């Protein structure tokens, strides 16, 4: 039978819940009591057995036998209790071992979780350093390609350039960031030769090559390559020659060109101010390169609508070119055209007419009335007449432009083509002639629209007919007839004002 041991102090209302240590302690006490009780029962059983086995008749044999049975039954119960107690003790020991193993495993799990956290942090740090290393490698690869390119450019330098004495200041052929269409047709060699003939600052061959490469990247819209390339070359020049050097001013002009193509006029203006200061210090305040930088600054101010600030810069550039090149030089005429456009945007039409008239006289004296620059200037002057509602003068100029059956190449333009090419075919292949035709078409449409009394609203409807009848280069007689028929149909009242000119100070 099983023996239930009550805890000391128990009230008997129910078993008290014991902790494992207390239960084991009490179980050991019960085992000790059962072992003592078993020894007593063994002694009683021995005495009863001796009494029953004694010689002779024994009184109360039945009572002794009954006692012996009770003692034997008690011994069995004691043995069962001892067995159960031993099982409980063994089970308690096993549970203790399991609990210790459980605690050990829990500690190991906590340690592994902490190690996992450390490993995650280490992995994140390693990944961050890997990304930083990859970015550094990419940047170094880009710098390496730039340095390799700059190293290749050095083969264009003269072999003894560092040993040569400094030549007198000469004209910067890359100074003009916004050249006219004829200047855009010239290659770096032609520009360098022209600068050498004028005794101007001569650009090193590698800078001319770098300029062409930057122009190519900018034309493809790859400004992320063009800008670092310019900045790397600028840093190299500043390290080798110092900041106040004509080559540094040239690189500032090239970088300003890239910013201008990105419509970052403020940054380009700051660079040109720096280039102007360098050129004034190194080349003198009346050098052609200074005039070119002043003109470029005036163009940038004009693109930002700051015409009042642009006009004195353009005026100073004109004065320098008149003093250095002479009053009848083509560059003076180009500067007069820029100054006239600035005055036109400010409504100074008297100055506009005066500047255009002087530019016309220069072009006609140098290239004759057939010079395309004459047609361009007349077209600009006609546009100014239209803004002042001087339709008669504008009509006469358009008639003069359209009366030219064929126009020769501009002054200074290279003569290309085969011997069988006519001058008109050469001009048709040039973008200059196409832009001139488009400008004349727009101006003549405005004039015809005003003469017909249709205003700007009717200009779109007759655009196709006018472009076919008036601006076909092979049929100028039809245009002259059309204008003559409309010359007598002026409005009695002044029409509304046209929109401002869409022409820039010089074409891009």
Curated annotation (Swiss-Prot):
Q: Where are the TPR repeats?
A: 207-240, 249-282, 291-324, 333-366, 375-408
UniProt tissue specificity: Expressed in postmeiotic male germ cells (at protein level). Expressed in the testes (at protein level). Expressed in spleen, intestine, brain and ovary.
How does gene deletion manifest? Male transgenic mice (expressing a KLC3 deletion mutant) display significantly reduced reproductive efficiency siring small sized litters. Show significantly reduced sperm count, defective mitochondrial sheath structure in a number of spermatids and produce spermatozoa that exhibit abnormal motility parameters.
Which residues are recorded as modified (Phosphoserine)? 173, 467, 506
Pfam families, alphabetized:
TPR_12
Question: Has UniProt tagged this entry with the keyword Lyase?
Answer: no
Q: Record keywords: Zinc included?
A: no
Which residues does UniProt assign to the signal peptide? none
- Where Phosphothreonine occurs along the chain? 502
* This protein's GO CC annotations: ciliary rootlet; cytoplasm; kinesin complex; microtubule; mitochondrion; motile cilium; neuron projection
Protein's GO biological process: axo-dendritic transport; intraciliary transport; sperm mitochondrial sheath assembly; spermatid development; spermatogenesis
Q: Where is this region: Disordered?
A: 1-20, 154-197, 409-441, 486-508
Q: Where is the composition biased (Basic and acidic residues)?
A: 161-173
Which compartments is it annotated to reside in?
Cytoplasm, Cytoskeleton; Mitochondrion
Q: Which SMART domains does the protein's record reference? A: TPR (SM00028)
Known role: Kinesin is a microtubule-associated force-producing protein that may play a role in organelle transport. Plays a role during spermiogenesis in the development of the sperm tail midpiece and in the normal function of spermatozoa. May play a role in the formation of the mitochondrial sheath formation in the developing spermatid midpiece.
Put simply, this protein is called Kinesin light chain 3
Q: List the source organism.
A: Mus musculus
Q: Which gene encodes it?
A: Klc3
